[in-house]
Each structure stands twice: as C-alpha cells, then as structure tokens.
Amino acid sequence: MKKHLITGLFAALALSASAQSFKEWLDPEVNAVNRAPMHTNYFAYESADVATRGLKEQSSRFMTLNGIWKFFWVKDADARPTDFWRVGYNDKGWNDIPVPGVWELNGFGDPIYVNIGYAWRNQFQNNPPQVPVENNHVGSYRREITVPADWKNKDIIAHFGSVTSNMYLWVNGRYVGYSEDSKLEAEFDLTPYLKPGQKNLIAFQVFRWCDGTYLEDQDFFRYSGVGRDCYLYARDKKRIQDIRVTPDLDADYRNGSLRVQLDVKGGGNVSLELLDAAGKQVATAAAKGSGTALINVENPHKWTAETPYLYTLRATLQGSSEVIPVKVGFRKIELKGEQILVNGHPVLFKGANRHEMDPDGGYVISRERMLQDIQVMKQFNLNAVRTCHYPDNNLWYDLCDQYGIYVVAEANIESHGMGYGEQTLAKRDDYRKAHLERNQRNVQRSFNHPSIIFWSLGNEAGYGPNFEAAYDWVKAEDPSRACQYEQAGKTGKTDIYCPMYYGYEGCRKYCEDASMTKPLIQCEYAHAMGNSEGGFKEYWDLVRKYPKYQGGFIWDFVDQSPRWTGKNGKMIYAYGGDFNRFDASDVNFCDNGLISPDRVPNPHMYEVGRIYQDIWTTPADLENGEKIG
C-alpha cells in the first residue's frame, strides 16, 4: 500500500509539472491560463459597518501577500530553476525581496531607459513573438502563508496587482495558471489548491521579457517584478460576481439615473441602496439575479472636476452577508457637434501625461505619492490626466474620482519599436487577440469610475484591423463614453482627433476647416524637457478662440529618474546611461517632466500653471475707470 501511495504521489507531481507547457511566454495567442475573468474594481465586505469604512485591509475577508518573499534571480532565461515550486524545495540560500518591489531597485540587474525601441535592441533583432533568452532575467518567488481557518467554506481568490512581464503560478506544488499584461491585475481562484488553517506554499516565476513585451514599448524606465499590491480575498459561494454602474442625466441635465448591471453567481435577489456623501439614503431598488436595475434620482449633485461629488451605491445579495460599496458620480458625457460636453457644457482639458514612476519604488507608487501628484495638479490648474500608456493602479482612479481629475484611461498597448508600416502589430493576426483583450480588460476593470471620460486604445502602435476591432468592441460595450486613438488620425476609428505635437499652424487650419468635425484634443503636446514650454500661450490662444479645440495633455508630468548612488558615492537622479555601457539607452530623455522626481515643480511648470488658469481678467477701459471684466 505504501509503495502505491508513493507511486501515486510522484504521478500527481508529474501531472502538475506537465500541466503548463512553458511555451506560453512565446505564444501571443495565449495570454492567460486559468486567470479569472476581469470584473469591475470593488471589494465585498462582510457587513455594512465594515463597508462604510471602505478599507479592505480592515476586512476579515482580506489577507495581504505584501511583504518579504524568498527570491532567486538569474540573468538568462534558460538558467531559471524549473522545480522551485515543489513543497520540499530548499530555498535557504535564496535572497529576500519585498512584494511589491521591482528587481532593479532592489539589487537585481540594472534599470533600462529607452524611448523608442525595445530594451533588447543592442543584442537582438525584433522577431515577434520571439524574445531573447540571453539577458532575459527571470525571478522566482516562494512564500509560506497560513490562510484563516474560517475561510474554509469560502472561495479564495488571489489578486496580483501588476507583474512585469508575466507570471506562472503554483500553490502547494500544483500548477495554477499563467498571465500576461503587466499593468492590469491577474486574479486566480485558489479554492481547489489552498488548505485553510494550515501552511500553504505560494510560488511564482516572472520573466523580464515575453511575447507580450512587444506591446509594452512605452517611453519609460523598464523595470521587472511586482509593481502593485498582492493579496488574497474570500468570497461567498453565492455572490455578486460583477457590478457595473452607468450614470446619466436627462435632456435638461437636471435629473439623474443609474443603470446598474449585475452578474450574480448562484442567483438570488439583490437589494440596492444609494447613499449621499453624508450617508443619508437617497434611493433604493431591487434586481432579480443577473440583469439590470434602474435608479432614478431627482436633481442629484453633479460630478465634474470642479465639483467631484460622490454617492455610494451599496449592493447586497439576499442570503449573503456580503456588502459591495461602489462610488458613483452623476455626470453625462456627450459628443455634440464639434465638442465634448460634460453635463451639457464644453470642457477645456488642461492635461498632462503621467507615468506611474517613483524615484525610490519605480513602478511601486504609494498612496501618499499619488495624493502629492493630485495636489500638484490642482495647485497648477491641471484638470485632466492621461494614464500613459497603460492602466494605472486602481487607487489612482479612486483619488481622481474623489478630488476631481478628468481621466483618459489608456490600454496597455504600445509597439512603437515595430514602426507604423506593414510590420506593425496592429495588422498581425497573431496579435489580434492581445490588442482586443487588453482593451476589454481595461474597460471591464475601470468601468465604474466617473472620472474616466474617454477610453484610449493605446499609444504609438500603428493602425490596422486590430485597433478597429478594439474600437468597435469598446463602443458597443460602453456607448456612454468617447473613445480615442492617436494613430487613427482624422478619418479612422476615433471619436476625437487626438494628434501629438501638432504645430500651431496645423491646429489653426484644422479649427478653420469646416469639414473637420471631430474635437481637437492633443494627446501629447508642449514637450516639457529642459528650458521648455515656449509657445504654450499661443497654443492656448487658439484653444480659447476655436470651440472645437479643447486642449491637450502635456508630455509629461514627472521626471522619471530613479534615486541612485553615483560613482562618487553621492545621491543622484540617474539617467538611462548611468548604469552600464552595454544595455540600450536613450540617456537623459527620461526627464521631460513638469515636476522633478521628488515632485518639486520645474521652472516651466509655473508657465503652465498660469496659462492653464481658469479665471482671466482684461481691462475694459482703464482711462475712464471702467471695471476689469
């Protein structure tokens, strides 16, 4: 009998080891294995009282995976350990690394900064979906955790907020799944793998580059590892799986409505309660299982960047203790004539492009840093941000909802290094799924944020049928918002003409051309490197003269340099060329910001703050003492 048990154990281990092909990282048509479907960003609390506090970390249904993990780093992908996920594997000689944390700022490899082109450009010729093996660093992670015993009858979900460039996951020696798309969360149902009340081994492996890296050629420092929070959470077996809220206003922009779409696992009635900012009940509704409910509200407070009033919608499934709070704002986005309207009024978008970049954490951005960024934006009259060029941390959208920042929410697509011609990935069938999936997941996850006014399909990735398919899907899925893409130009599938670095004369001619009916909002302009922002006033003279010209997004908000120890032992903010002589580098082009890495305004930020100001006065007749108006 003992021999049979041992034989069965080895057979089970062999089955687990062979469940993944290890070809996923080079297959553009396999972007996930066993990854849970994307849903809107919410947390299901165990009671209304805990839900009111709105801090998932205080919930008994939450368990953080942040902290110190055992870590093993190799320079080349073919040197990676292949059995490290086994329960009895000896990791005593491994290093420690924080999660979240990027490798290069924790002593493993050097940061790479390139603008156009891939980080491997000095060693490897582009050949999608193939990526290098040499210098393709791989990090392997292990950690033992004890899952709460009272989660035994729950479904247990793992949330990995952002992992670059991919991840393979094992639990207790069993293969769970795989995920790509570095800037959106990967969730996995771990219920069949975990043992509540006991120690459990979680192991995952991350490659610096995979086939998806061809879609992540953004102009920023290239780091690897875990960039956002990771945690487990417990759900009832019978539950609200997804909840989407679409606000609207009537033709007079007075009365409001909320269209609530529900996906319920296991069926049952859902009660909906709308609370104002003071916690007072405003309206209620009910829904039978999966479907749609409509909530009408007479003359609600309206959400704008100037008046970011938020209500709370609470959803509870009958027979379940779970309470899901969703922040909602009543606002209406319209494309009328040649303008974008918010609540019936044209808006001037005084924006900037913002990379998620911290001088000490790289991709790891604290709440305090995000609040600092919003404070600076408000101080200098910015009212809009483009999430260049990928979805941001969920918390960033929450804060934009709360403090009032219009958001252009961009999908994680840029393939600039492949060019815009026939070789563009936008025209390749094998990358069609990835283009579509990254846009779908972006919309599915961030749907409920009132601050999001446009979806953006990506950046500098050519144009072709893959983007046309993505546009069609986004517009069908969410007709309440505009959708833009720069490479679609004036006549392609984009609701907004959103060029980059369009000159003064080009802007003027577009505004005076009656055949051009799309709003003009530059997705990038006024490049803020060095002694810059000359001519910015002239741009805004046009914006304030021509109704169809509604502003733009400066490149870019913050200098990207990491804090580094220089050769003389002193602290520096490092450029792309400061680390070694063999990696690709576009040197100091990483610092194009309105503010420095530590968020001190650069001199040209003061010029921007003045031109972006909301209130302008002009003397009517000083000689006769007329009032300034």
Cite the ranges covered by each PLM segment.
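Short hydrophobic beta-strand segments in globular cytosolic domains
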Residues: 176-177, 282, 347
